């Protein structure tokens, strides 16, 4: 089966969640309203999902569709993030990894990043871990976030005081970074951590 675009993936997840809640699939117009697109745009997404093998539909029946391959709990691993100094943003699809549904917030997109560096070790986020990020453009003080500053990304604890933002490491040997708030873009909040131990064991550490 072919890879989905981000929008196609979001549409498919919406269809799955709609069916779980209502017992039947959404109409084209309901999909269009959810994503603020035209009915034709929604129809094109359904055609693409069908061609790629993720749904099946019956001609002439607006709600006659079923999901043939679930992606609801499969999260894209899209590169690495520096837990240390800022680093040029690296974003490319490496893989999809299935995570427990309890770690995923309904209505949000999620993605995984591989951690490089040791600036967050006091929060039990270590070099080589995979952090699960809930995509959002805001944060509360104390949240661990993936943040972009002038095209470079970093993983830090977020604190804002007036017009200044502090990106604070969880490592006593490293210093915090300070920026004007308008220079900092929040990419998302850390909601989980994957760690692979010797012997191939994988577990979640935090949420």
Swiss-Prot record:
HAMAP family: LexA. Transmembrane segments: none annotated. Represses a number of genes involved in the response to DNA damage (SOS response), including recA and lexA. In the presence of single-stranded DNA, RecA interacts with LexA causing an autocatalytic cleavage which disrupts the DNA-binding part of LexA, leading to derepression of the SOS regulon and eventually DNA repair. GO terms for molecular function: DNA binding; serine-type endopeptidase activity. It comes from the Bacteria. CDD domains: S24_LexA-like. It comes from Thermotoga neapolitana (strain ATCC 49049 / DSM 4359 / NBRC 107923 / NS-E). The keyword Glycoprotein does not apply. The record marks 83-84 as: Cleavage. The gene is lexA. This is LexA repressor. Its EC number is 3.4.21.88. GO terms for biological process: DNA repair; DNA replication; negative regulation of DNA-templated transcription; proteolysis; SOS response. It catalyses: Hydrolysis of Ala-|-Gly bond in repressor LexA. Homodimer. The keyword Hydrolase applies.
